[in-house]
Amino acid sequence: MSLSIPKIENGAAGDLEVSDKVFGQGFNESLVHQLVVGYLAAARSGTKAQKSRSDVSGGGKKPWKQKGSGHARAGTTRSPLWRTGGVTFAASNRNYRQKLNKKMYRAAVRSIFSELLRQGRLVVSDGIVPTSPKTRELAAKLKSFGEGYTVILAEQLDLNLALSSRNLPNVSINTADTLSPVDLVHAERVIATSSAIRKLEVRLS
C-alpha cells in the first residue's frame, strides 16, 4: 500500500507516491513527547556549578571557643551562614541526556511525519531550493505556501538554501540526516524535496 504527498512545482499540483510504512503510521503521542524531551535535554550543557561547604577553602579550625566570647557559636567559616561560606544546596555538573534507542527514535519520527501528512502540513517541492543565494527569491517562494513557521527539508545541506534562509524569520532548515523533532512538531508546514523524502523512506523503514 502507498500514500500520496501533495507536490507543488511552479504552481502545478501533483502527488508523490510514498510508503505507508513510513508516512502512514498512527500518532504515538507519548513516544513523540519522549523524543522531543530527550532532544531538548541533550542540548543542555549541564555545566552550572557552585561550591558547597565541602568545596570552599578554609574553615578547618573553629573560629572561636564555644562559650564566653559573646559571639554566636560557630564551628567553621565554611558554613552557608557565613559570607565566604559555601552554598547550602550547591548546583553541580550534570548530564541531562536521556536514553532513546534507534528503534524508538525511528518510530517517533515516522509518527511525526505521518501526522504531518494527515494534517496537510507536509508538501513536496523540489523548486524550493534556490539556485543562487537570494533571500528575496526564497521569500517569494515561501509566500506562495502561506505564512507561519516553515521547515524546509532537504536531502543534504545546500549552501544557497542556507544563505538564502538565514535572514528569514520563522524559517528553519533540516536535512534528512539531521532532523530536529522540535522544529517538525512546531512547524505550520514542512516543505520537503523529493530526494529528501526518498532518503527518509530508506532511513526510517
Curated annotation (Swiss-Prot):
Residues 48-79 are annotated as: Disordered. GO terms for biological process: translation. The keyword Ribonucleoprotein applies. GO terms for molecular function: rRNA binding; structural constituent of ribosome. GO terms for cellular component: ribonucleoprotein complex; ribosome. Keywords: Ribonucleoprotein, Ribosomal protein, RNA-binding, rRNA-binding. Signal peptide: none annotated. The keyword Disulfide bond does not apply. InterPro entries: Ribosomal_uL4, Ribosomal_uL4-like, Ribosomal_uL4_dom_sf. Belongs to the universal ribosomal protein uL4 family. Part of the 50S ribosomal subunit. PANTHER family: 50S RIBOSOMAL PROTEIN L4, LARGE RIBOSOMAL SUBUNIT PROTEIN UL4M. One of the primary rRNA binding proteins, this protein initially binds near the 5'-end of the 23S rRNA. It is important during the early stages of 50S assembly. It makes multiple contacts with different domains of the 23S rRNA in the assembled 50S subunit and ribosome. Forms part of the polypeptide exit tunnel. This is Large ribosomal subunit protein uL4. The gene is rplD.
